[in-house]
Amino acid sequence: MARRGKKPVVRTLEDLTLDSGYGGAADSVRSSNLSLCCSDSHPASPYGGSCWPPLADSMHSRHNSFDTVNTALVEDSEGLDCAGQHCSRLLPDLDEVPWTLQELELLLLRSRDPRAGPAVPGSLPKDALAKLSMLVSRALVRIAKEAQRLSLRFAKCTKYEIQSAMEIVLSWGLAAHCTAAALAALSLYNMSSAGGDRLGRGKSARCGLTFSVGRVYRWMVDSRVALRIHEHAAIYLTACMESLFRDIYSRVLASGLPRSCSGPGPGSSSGSGPGPGSGPGAPAADKERETPGGGAASGGPCSAASSASGGSSCCAPPATAATAVPPTTATAAVAANHHHHHHTLHEAPKFTVETLEHTVNNDSEIWGLLQPYQHLICGKNASGVLSLPESLNLHRDPQRPSKPGELPMFSQSELRTIEQSLLATRVGSIAELSDLVSRAMHHLQPLNAKHHGNGTPMHHKQGALYWEPEALYTLCYFMHCPQMEWENPNVEPSKVNLQVERPFLVLPPLMEWIRVAVAHAGHRRSFSMDSDDVRQAARLLLPGVDCEPRQLKADDCFCASRKLDAVAIEAKFKQDLGFRMLNCGRTDLVKQAVSLLGPDGINTMSEQGMTPLMYACVRGDEAMVQMLLDAGADLNVEVVSTPHKYPSVHPETRHWTALTFAVLHGHIPVVQLLLDAGAKVEGSVEHGEENYSETPLQLAAAVGNFELVSLLLERGADPLIGTMYRNGISTTPQGDMNSFSQAAAHGHRNVFRKLLAQPEKEKSDILSLEEILAEGTDLAETAPPPLCASRNSKAKLRALREAMYHSAEHGYVDVTIDIRSIGVPWTLHTWLESLRIAFQQHRRPLIQCLLKEFKTIQEEEYTEELVTQGLPLMFEILKASKNEVISQQLCVIFTHCYGPYPIPKLTEIKRKQTSRLDPHFLNNKEMSDVTFLVEGRPFYAHKVLLFTASPRFKALLSSKPTNDNTCIEIGYVKYPIFQLVMQYLYYGGPESLLIKNNEIMELLSAAKFFQLEALQRHCEIICAKSINTDNCVDIYSHAKFLGVTELSAYCEGYFLKNMMVLIENEAFKQLLYDKNGEGAGQDVLQDLQRTLAIRIQSIHLSSSKGSVV
């Protein structure tokens, strides 16, 4: 195909965007991504593209915004490659993710349909798991980056920031699934908080999750998602990732990829976009190939729109929404076709790299999410096909009337118009955009009311959301297509083009603009979408666009609600003007501003429930704070908790004071000023009352600000005060996550030591009912001074135990050791987590210290975790350790866990009553009817006895003809041993046998060979009685060789019970570590682990507690 020539001009970053003043230019303000920010270096484009292609002639045709759904350029496919590989920045690659492939496989196997067969670990291919992990890690980075930006407003990441980040990044349906999973996990966690064993179970176990919540929390801290991380945020993020994995895995299995399509889908060579065969230079045969979904592969058959505009089949764009496949059913058609092939071939769905890539490439909800580009591609699959997500698919529900006689909500023509509105990518004017947005909102709001599970939050609690005029103008700026203005006959096309059009493949549909803008507005509890919401959406959805994160301002949630009359709106505007005057920083406008604020004057609250003093503290404006204090501002007024009056209050800010905001943003001079002026050092906490918000000291300890913590402690802040959750669930009267726990959870060792050094404050002598019952003493006989000291010590011990739990969960083992060093006892869980981290960090001295501490753990605290987590960890350390001290310490632990009870005895097997002969006939040639030849010597026997002795003898005798007088030769058995076997049979039991010590092993082998179970058990019992440290390895090796499980288990019990002595035995060490390289050492360790697990279950975890051994 002849192609137009391209100018070999290296274009700058400005070519990627219409400069908004907020980004796109090379010197634009970049978002604060901290450790999640991307590298400025970019790999070279593998396809030779280095710039955006020039505008094509076909784009100058007269199309309205609806036609942009179906119109794309051939060069646009190359433009996307250019955008992804060179011109657009890429997401950072994670060296480590907060989950393991073993955990991922366990999660997926748990989520599969039980009818698909048993979930066997190791049944999923490792390469597919690794591929899936890598893809979903990109979604993790996207969500973390958005949560990081949202957390800047309050310098804290809570569950609300994670939930909003999910709604910003994920489609409506995926976000709804993730939110439901997060709510379920948090509910389980809160319910488990009331139990007495909450510090003895891991956070993941308490939440019902597979991935480690503590590891996700540590990842968030290390990635600097926020200065402060709430534990609920880590639970939400963990549940979100698990939900994403399950969702993608279920889609892969549901796709049922047929064998004929087992190769990668279009552009699926790397799962990151259209491949080399999708461009205009692909062979003609490839261009005519259709995808299984009915649409054309990238660069496939031309659509009706492109044909109508004069395009040929050789230069057609990728198949797009309304032509090759209906826009609302593109993804469904692909899945349906796959389902048909699946049933045709009668194959079980397979999870492989090929099926994974094929599913991702054909799913518009997840393809863009899992790409490596920094901007988020939404609403398109790998072929560039636009489609509505299933949650917005009106054709799925044919709008049947809910009541008899009621008309359908939309006609079919209206449905097509609405769908085209949602999928529009370009507009020609602000009027056209306003009409499109109106149609879309009109469609989404009733859909949300009808299908609450589709995740379309189109309603605020106080009413429907609406678009401010400035937001529409900003959105029009990004969606505007100058060529569409040429529809007006009075407007002539410009002769000089000063702007570069973005390619179609990077333009998001209108529904994605709405989704992201609505999520941003919802996060700040606003009634309306403003221009900043649109700019934030442009930053996410378009390549090369950036803008600063939204700051905390008084006008964030201001809106002229249509429900208010003119007088109320006038007062709102005056109040807004007053806040603006105070926020400008001019201290000479305080009096004029106060006169505009309303009847509450200087203490008037904004829609966010904050006073001018709070906003000044957020900015760190010391001069304005002083002026407001001089003007009579209340130091200790709290953010209100009445949502009906102040609906835009962020839930986490309720009961915060001006001092809290100053501490949040680390403005130490302002904190000093407020405290000198009489601010309460504990914020809103009243003496003796429950605390439902975090104190300033908790917030300072969480961020690790040593100077601020010292200042608050000097002013009398109490580090033992925790936070009560609003559901009323708390484990202590003072709440959870006190200052000790905050510092330990974030790994601030110096701040934690500072808190420990703080002298204890004496409390009131009034006892609570809980403390009266705990003390078990009479009030009249209580001596106040000792009681105060005792109560303080108990409260501090509870606080430190909780801090130890969080530090161990999050992997801050040094903080955990510091807490242990002051006498706080171990729980099994904290000890195991600390040992795991020390082993991962290869800290040998710390491992030795922790192993020595195991004996301090009470046996009453042994739980199932010791079997499922502890034993595999310790045996892994034993396997990897080359340190004799560590090996000896582990042997001590194993012997201790095995317990003082004796090894379970082997019992004789009662021989079934069979035929027997007088011993006189033993090896008697007279009257014998069968002769055995053993070591060249004959041994005479009788068939009547041997035929019923065992299946082995029956088979030997049956194989010889009756009239054959030849001898039956017995190999591999010595004559004396064979004589003992025959003596056992003729005498009817082992009682008369005289077995020498050097014959017992051979007799055991013979009994096993001839399948004489009673004689075999008798030999096993003799071996068990004669076992000692010298022969135990030989007996065990012989028993394993023969497959005698009972004797092997007895030997394993002997090993565990005497391991402290045996570890010095060279033969035993050789058995464990497999120095001969025969591969048996690992099996021995696994067998020992299994035997010890059974023993622990019987003596520590069963109801009998030791009686079953």
Swiss-Prot record:
CDD domains on file: BACK_BTBD11, BTB_POZ_BTBD11, HFD_ABTB2-like
Gene coding for it: Abtb3
Residue ranges, annotated region (Disordered): 260-302
Feature: compositional bias, Gly residues: 264-280
Keyword Nucleus recorded: no
Regions that span the bilayer: 168-188
Species of the source: Mus musculus
Membrane topology recorded in Swiss-Prot or TrEMBL: Single-pass membrane protein
Name of the featured protein: Ankyrin repeat- and BTB/POZ domain-containing protein 3
Major subcellular location class: membrane
